[in-house]
Regions:
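Beta-strand-rich extracellular passenger or scaffold domains
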Residues: 1, 16-19, 275, 307
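The conserved beta-strand core of Leucine-Rich Repeat
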Residues: 109, 113-115
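Short, structured patches in soluble enzyme cores that scaffold and shape functional sites
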Residues: 15, 34, 42-44, 58, ...
């Protein structure tokens, strides 16, 4: 239980090939849970098939530095991050009980390259009331990603900074809920408390292109929701994203997409970002080209941002400046 099973482990150097180019078997390369003090550095992990390269849950003090993740094979629309910072839930992370809802904390991913993988790094499932803390994703390169580069679900006190995201379908999503949202087996109160994320998304360079992505394209999205009543097994509660600072990012939109998108948020600061719209003559994408989109959000400030429009497409419906939608926008 907790972080007590695997301790003081180092992987240093070398290449591990998942052989996904030759065989259609799911092949996660490194997987662990209930762990502490794990270091993975100077490695190349390549050719996974419909799987993650590294997957872990209920871990603390994990450092992944100067590694290369490349060449994913398999279903293009699957939820396979090269590094999955996972939620320890029995239906979602099998064979690693005790399922005590231990979150991840003190996770550092730096100086890594993600190229030709389905997704880069992050978390796509969540347990109500379980938050991962002090997650640092900094100084990495993401190249040719057909899904998200970074997906941060239920993160607090975390930072996503100084990353280069090039030729990707979507850049960074930060959310306090998930489509795959599980109830707490410990038993939560009927209403979840409002949580301030106290996190930063800063100084990232993001280029969004058409990857025939099944969802909407965007540079940065913050996503949450207020549920006034219970839905299935999920209790009613405030699942909105609060307290995130978004500043100093450079976002280039090379298809009809959103630059920065706030949906179900509160007290967000969006400052001093540069968004360059470069929609081509034959526009692609599903979102209609809005620089900053705000839906059902309150108490946020958007100021000091620069918008540059060098688009060659003359359809004015494809680009809007700041769009406010909803009673609290």
């Amino acid at each position: 239980s907790g972080y007590t099973v695997f301790k003081n482990i180092t992987f240093h150097g070398g290449t591990i090939d998942g052989q996904g180019a030759q065989h259609s078997y799911k092949s996660t390369i490194l997987r662990f849970a209930h762990a502490s003090d794990v270091t993975i550095e100077n490695m190349t992990l390549t050719n996974t098939y419909s799987s993650h390269s590294i997957e872990f849950a209920a871990a603390q003090n994990v450092t992944i530095n100067n590694c290369v993740f490349s060449d994913y094979h398999g279903k293009a629309d699957s939820n396979n991050e090269a590094i999955q910072i996972e939620t320890l839930q029995r239906d979602h992370f099998a064979s690693y009980g005790k399922y005590d809802e231990t979150p991840n904390r003190n996770i550092t991913i730096t100086n890594c390259t993600f190229k030709n993988v389905q997704r880069g790094v992050g978390t796509h499932a969540a347990i109500v009331g379980c938050y991962h803390s002090n997650i640092r994703i900094e100084n990495n390169k993401f190249i040719n990603i057909p899904g998200y580069a970074i997906i941060a679900t239920n993160y607090i006190n975390s930072s996503i900074k100084n990353n280069e995201i090039t030729d990707c379908a979507s850049g960074i999503i930060f959310r306090d809920m998930a489509i795959t949202l599980y109830p707490s087996e410990k038993g939560n109160k009927s209403k979840t408390p409002k949580i301030s994320s106290k996190s930063v998304i800063a100084n990232n360079k993001i280029e969004i292109t058409d990857k025939k992505y099944k969802n909407v394209n965007y540079g940065i999205q913050l996503l949450g929701e207020y549920r006034s009543k219970k839905k299935g097994k999920i209790p009613k509660g405030d699942y909105r994203v609060y307290g995130v600072q978004v500043y100093g990012n450079e976002i280039t939109l090379k298809n009809a997409s959103y630059g920065i998108w706030l949906n179900g948020t509160g007290k967000i600061r969006v400052n001093n970002n540069v968004i360059n719209m470069q929609v081509p003559k034959k526009a692609s994408g599903k979102s209609g080209g809005t620089v900053v989109r705000v839906i059902s959000s309150k108490g946020s400030r958007i100021n000091g941002n620069t918008i540059i429009n060098t688009s060659k497409n003359k359809n004015k419906k494809l680009y809007r400046g700041i769009e406010l939608i909803g009673k609290k926008a």
